[in-house]
């Protein structure tokens, strides 16, 4: 479809609505299953440091499959790719439901998620264009975060009530996501005819990595989103251990409610980014990134539920405002160079490598007995410094470009 035809289409087209609905149910299942599975391993008396390992098993699938999923997304109609990926998530949820190893089942969900991600973001560049792409990303993030909000709370609350029901609901939601994918219009493959030999695919993927990392704006986006999502997933597990220490509450529901506050904030921040940031003004998001780290450090010192809620909402608002423009920038740069699916696969490699490293470090410091409040403060300070360095680096690159 031509760029002009895309620009003339309303943002909330039939295809866009179908994509948003499918994404909502898929993300709902992901987040409900995470907290239900955390409750399961807690019930089975696994040690505290094993909780991040669950997410690391999930994340590792993204890294292993990174060379292949971008081409998979670009070689077939992306709506059908999303449907197959949700089917794999359903299979993983059933593995956990029927009492098999939860780490194995959650890894299978990770395989589905790895295949799903390039397709869900890549399809936005095929059904929207230009400045509508930033708005579409804002809507996608809002749909995702609404699902995180409801899914996280549902997973924790249902697990406190009946763990078997919680796991069954997760499987049902994935089944609904599979059905929702059937309503996405079938679009032509973005890049059909590529080689399916593993060696050629791996070479093609790392070529795409080099192309994007040599592009200044794409590199800036990749670094920013990797830091953000690495920190975001670590914060989720920090909350699980922080709540009993700082608030004296030991149920499964409270950490999910606190995670939901971040989700509410990200919805607001994503909306603000769609309203106030364009592809030409992406750098406006950087101060929000620094403030995320400051807010996390302050949050870790709290012992009051109302202040915890307020600070987590603020962290979410800053996060949404920070990450949405960076996603849109990468999709635009990727679509014009290596393909949107490959660009998102490269992004996933960066983000999940950051997650794996941060979760691994978090697991180590917990195992070593470092107080969780100290971990939270240190985590916030390091994140703020990392984004400040990214900001300074980008400013320097811009000055050099202007001088030339």
Swiss-Prot record:
GO terms for cellular component: plasma membrane. The chain crosses the membrane at residues 16-36, 53-73, 91-111, 139-159, 164-184, 195-213, 227-247, 253-273, 285-305, 310-330, 350-370, 372-392. InterPro entries: LysoPLipid__transptr_LplT, MFS, MFS_trans_sf. The keyword Transport applies. One of its GO terms (molecular function) is lysophospholipid:sodium symporter activity. It is a multi-pass membrane protein. It is found in: Cell inner membrane. It comes from the Bacteria. The keyword Cell membrane applies. Keywords: Cell inner membrane, Cell membrane, Lipid transport, Membrane, Transmembrane, Transmembrane helix, Transport. Catalyzes the facilitated diffusion of 2-acyl-glycero-3-phosphoethanolamine (2-acyl-GPE) into the cell. Belongs to the major facilitator superfamily. LplT (TC 2.A.1.42) family. This is Lysophospholipid transporter LplT. The lineage of its organism: Bacteria, Pseudomonadati, Pseudomonadota, Gammaproteobacteria, Enterobacterales. The gene is lplT.
């Amino acid at each position: 479809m031509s760029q002009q035809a895309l620009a003339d289409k309303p943002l909330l087209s039939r295809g866009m609505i179908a994509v948003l609905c499918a994404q909502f149910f898929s993300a709902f299942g992901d987040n409900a299953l995470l907290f239900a599975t955390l409750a399961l391993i807690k019930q089975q008396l696994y040690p505290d440091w094993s909780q991040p390992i669950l997410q690391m098993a999930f994340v590792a699938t993204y890294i292993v499959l990174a060379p292949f999923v971008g081409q998979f997304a670009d070689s077939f109609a992306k709506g059908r790719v999303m449907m197959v990926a949700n089917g794999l998530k359903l299979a993983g949820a059933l593995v956990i439901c029927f009492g098999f190893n939860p780490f194995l089942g959650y890894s299978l969900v990770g395989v589905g998620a790895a295949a799903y991600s390039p397709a869900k973001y890549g399809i936005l560049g095929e059904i929207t264009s230009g400045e509508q792409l930033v708005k579409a990303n804002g809507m996608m993030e809002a749909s995702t975060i609404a699902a995180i909000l409801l899914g996280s709370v549902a997973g924790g609350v249902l697990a406190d009530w009946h763990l078997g029901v919680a796991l069954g609901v997760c499987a049902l939601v994935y089944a609904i996501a599979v059905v929702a994918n059937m309503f996405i219009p079938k679009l032509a493959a973005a890049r059909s005819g590529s080689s399916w030999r593993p060696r050629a695919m791996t070479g093609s993927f790392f070529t795409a990595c080099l192309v994007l990392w040599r592009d200044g704006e794409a590199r800036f986006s990749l670094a920013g989103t990797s830091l953000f999502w690495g920190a975001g997933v670590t914060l989720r597990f920090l909350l699980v251990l922080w709540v009993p220490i700082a608030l004296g509450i030991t149920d499964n529901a409270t950490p999910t409610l606190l995670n939901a506050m971040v989700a509410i904030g990200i919805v607001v921040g994503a909306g603000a980014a769609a309203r106030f940031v364009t592809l030409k003004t992406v750098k406006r998001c950087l101060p929000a990134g620094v403030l995320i780290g400051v807010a996390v450090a302050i949050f870790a010192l709290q012992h009051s539920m109302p202040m915890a809620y307020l600070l987590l909402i603020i962290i979410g608002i800053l996060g949404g405002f920070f990450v949405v423009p960076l996603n849109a920038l990468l999709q635009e740069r990727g679509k014009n160079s290596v393909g949107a699916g490959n660009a998102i696969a490269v992004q996933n490699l960066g983000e999940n490598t950051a997650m794996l490293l941060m979760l691994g470090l978090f697991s180590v410091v917990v195992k070593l007995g470092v107080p969780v409040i100290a971990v939270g403060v240190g985590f916030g300070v390091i994140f703020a410094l990392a984004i400040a360095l990214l900001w300074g680096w980008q400013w320097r690159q811009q000055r050099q470009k202007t001088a030339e």
